C-alpha cells in the first residue's frame, strides 16, 4: 500500500510541474461549451460532427461543468490529474496483491519508469483523455486480478460481471482500447462454464457501448468518431509505428531501465 501511495504522489507532483492545456484539449472544451449551450455534442452549432475521440472524456468534463462553476480548463486539468494519480495507485496496489509473498518487498518499477518519462508527465494533464485511459487500464487490471482470485468462490459471479461491464466501456474511453477490452471479454466468455453465464456477460458488457453506437450512427452518420476518418485510422502505418518506438526508447535510453527491471524481477522471483 505504501509503495502505491508513493508512486502516485510522485506522479501527481511531476504532472503538476508540467501542467498545461493543448490545442486538441481546447477542441474538447469547445464541444463541452456547445453541450452547455444546448447545441448538442458538436464542434460547430448546426454541424453534426463528432470532433472528439473519447466519448466519456467530454461528458465527464460536461458533468463537472454542471456541478461546479469552475472554468472548463480547470475542470479538465483536475480530472486528468486525478485520474492519472488514481491509475498509478490502483495499478501498483493491484500488482502488489498479485505478488503477495512473505519477505518480498514490492517496488512499483513500472510506475516509476513511466512517470520518469517527460511525455508521461506532460500528458497527465493537457486537457486530453490520457489520464482517463490510464485509469481505465488500471481498473481493468485490478478487476482482472480480482476475477482470477475469486473464481470458484461465492463472489465469482459479481466479479465477472463487473469485469465485463468495465471491459465494455473501452469503446467509449477510446475506440482502440476495445482491443484490450475485447480480449478480456473473450477470456471471460471462454472461462464461463455455460451459455447462461455467457449471456449475462454480454448483458453486462454490451448495452452501454451499443446504445451509444446506435446514437453515433443516427446522430453523426458514422460508425467511428470523425477523428478516425480525418486521420485515416483504418490504414496500417508500421513504419510510423516503428518511428514512435525508436523515438520513445532512444532519447530516454528506456531499454536500460526495462532491462534492469526485468533482471531485478527475475532475481526476486
Label the predicted regions.
Residues 1-269:
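Membrane-proximal envelope and lipid/glycan-remodeling enzymes
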Amino acid at each position: 500500500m505504501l509503495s502505491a501511495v508513493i508512486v502516485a504522489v510522485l506522479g501527481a507532483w511531476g504532472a503538476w510541474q508540467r501542467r498545461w492545456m493543448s490545442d486538441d484539449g481546447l477542441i474538447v472544451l469547445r464541444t463541452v461549451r456547445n453541450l452547455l449551450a444546448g447545441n448538442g455534442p458538436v464542434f460547430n452549432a448546426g454541424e453534426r460532427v463528432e470532433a472528439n475521440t473519447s466519448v466519456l472524456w467530454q461528458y465527464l468534463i460536461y458533468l463537472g461543468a454542471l456541478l461546479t462553476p469552475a472554468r472548463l480548463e480547470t475542470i479538465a486539468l483536475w480530472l486528468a490529474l486525478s485520474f492519472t494519480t488514481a491509475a498509478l495507485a490502483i495499478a501498483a496496489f493491484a500488482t502488489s496483491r498479485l505478488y503477495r509473498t512473505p519477505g518480498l518487498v514490492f517496488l512499483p518499477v513500472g510506475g516509476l519508469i513511466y512517470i520518469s518519462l517527460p511525455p508521461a508527465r506532460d500528458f497527465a494533464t493537457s486537457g486530453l483523455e490520457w489520464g482517463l485511459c490510464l485509469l481505465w487500464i488500471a481498473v481493468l487490471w485490478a478487476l482482472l486480478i480480482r476475477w482470477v482470485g475469486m473464481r470458484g468462490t461465492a463472489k465469482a459471479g459479481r466479479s465477472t460481471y463487473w469485469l465485463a461491464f468495465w471491459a465494455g466501456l473501452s469503446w467509449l474511453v477510446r475506440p482502440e482500447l476495445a482491443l484490450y477490452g475485447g480480449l478480456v471479454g473473450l477470456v471471460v466468455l471462454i472461462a464461463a462454464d455455460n451459455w447462461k453465464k455467457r449471456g449475462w456477460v454480454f448483458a453486462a458488457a454490451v448495452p452501454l457501448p451499443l446504445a451509444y453506437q446506435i446514437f453515433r450512427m443516427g446522430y453523426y452518420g458514422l460508425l467511428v468518431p470523425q477523428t478516425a476518418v480525418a486521420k485515416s485510422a483504418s490504414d496500417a502505418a508500421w513504419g510510423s509505428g516503428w518511428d514512435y518506438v525508436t523515438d520513445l526508447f532512444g532519447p530516454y535510453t528506456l531499454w536500460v531501465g526495462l532491462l534492469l527491471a526485468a533482471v531485478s524481477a527475475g532475481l526476486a522471483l
